[in-house]
Swiss-Prot record:
The keyword Isomerase applies. The modification N6-succinyllysine is found at K53. Residues 20-108 form the PPIase FKBP-type domain. It is a peripheral membrane protein. It catalyses: [protein]-peptidylproline (omega=180) = [protein]-peptidylproline (omega=0). It comes from the Eukaryota. Its main location: cytoplasm. GO terms for molecular function: activin receptor binding; calcium channel regulator activity; enzyme binding; FK506 binding; Hsp70 protein binding; I-SMAD binding; identical protein binding; peptidyl-prolyl cis-trans isomerase activity. Interacts with TGFBR1; prevents TGFBR1 phosphorylation by TGFBR2 and stabilizes it in the inactive conformation. Interacts with ACVR1B and SMAD7. Identified in a complex composed of RYR1, PDE4D, PKA, FKBP1A and protein phosphatase 1 (PP1). Interacts directly with RYR2. Interacts directly with RYR3. Interacts directly with RYR1. Interacts with GLMN; rapamycin and FK506 abolish the interaction with GLMN in a dose dependent manner. Ubiquitous. The modification Phosphoserine is found at S10. The lineage of its organism: Eukaryota, Metazoa, Chordata, Craniata, Vertebrata. This is Peptidyl-prolyl cis-trans isomerase FKBP1A. The gene is Fkbp1a.
Amino acid sequence: MGVQVETISSGDGRTFPKRGQTCVVHYTGMLEDGKKFDSSRDRNKPFKFTLGKQEVIRGWEEGVAQMSVGQRAKLIISPDYAYGATGHPGIIPPHATLVFDVELLKLE
């Protein structure tokens, strides 16, 4: 499946991230059953990553690249685009499909 992007609210429709740019996002990560495992919103601190540098899972690389600044979307990410057969011990089980509520705040 890879990554499926479902828009929650639209962005500007013009400003999309490019490789090498820093994406500033707020996110909430959940398992398929809705159990939250991480949230930048709870920490009240946006998360930053550089697109194309493999600092995040493949589902984020491909999903966030399809979003425009200001957009909020649900990213549904299959295990092969997330943490695969290993999972993330104690947090994400093996072969888990993940759901992220991601808002692309700005690009740097």
